[in-house]
């Protein structure tokens, strides 16, 4: 197996169990439900059935992307372990999250010049994004190297 981290955003519509079973790391987006902020922790803080029931009952919800500082801390934990990173973001067509990831990448490349961070725009969302991550996990598990992105 290759020694790089395959990573994405929590918006890939995969369960925590699936992320773990495929060895895919993820960073959590944020959302607000009726004025209260939550981390998109895959249904731990607010179970999905409660979330959708709240929407059904007229709750307002909005999302916010991961910021550059959050990406920096997230990526740095892997870099300290001597790992390169292939991070695939939610589509740039619906989110600016790729910009936050790129800012963190540029900052960390100065501190860890021996490590590589690859940021890829999935151009997808939801289940399509999740399927793409599964395909990348298959490639990684079959010897794909991060620099072959």
Give residue spans per PLM region.
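Acidic/polar active-site rim loop that often engages polyanionic ligands
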Residues: 113-114, 128-138
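N-terminal glycine-rich anion-binding loop in soluble enzyme alpha/beta folds
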Residues: 5-70
């Amino acid at each position: 197996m290759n020694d790089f981290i395959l990573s994405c955003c929590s918006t890939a519509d995969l369960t925590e169990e699936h992320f773990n079973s495929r060895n895919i790391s993820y960073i959590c987006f944020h959302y607000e439900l009726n004025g209260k902020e939550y981390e998109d922790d895959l249904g731990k803080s607010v179970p999905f059935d409660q979330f959708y029931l709240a929407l059904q009952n007229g709750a307002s919800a909005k999302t916010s992307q991961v910021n550059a500082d959050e990406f920096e801390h997230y990526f740095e934990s892997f870099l300290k372990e001597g790992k390169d990173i292939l991070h695939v973001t939610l589509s740039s067509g619906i989110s600016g999250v790729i910009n936050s990831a790129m800012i963190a990448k540029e900052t960390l490349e100065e501190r860890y010049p021996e490590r590589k961070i690859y940021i890829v725009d999935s151009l997808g969302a939801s289940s399509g994004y999740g399927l793409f991550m599964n395909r990348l996990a298959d490639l990684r598990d079959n010897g794909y190297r991060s620099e072959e992105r």
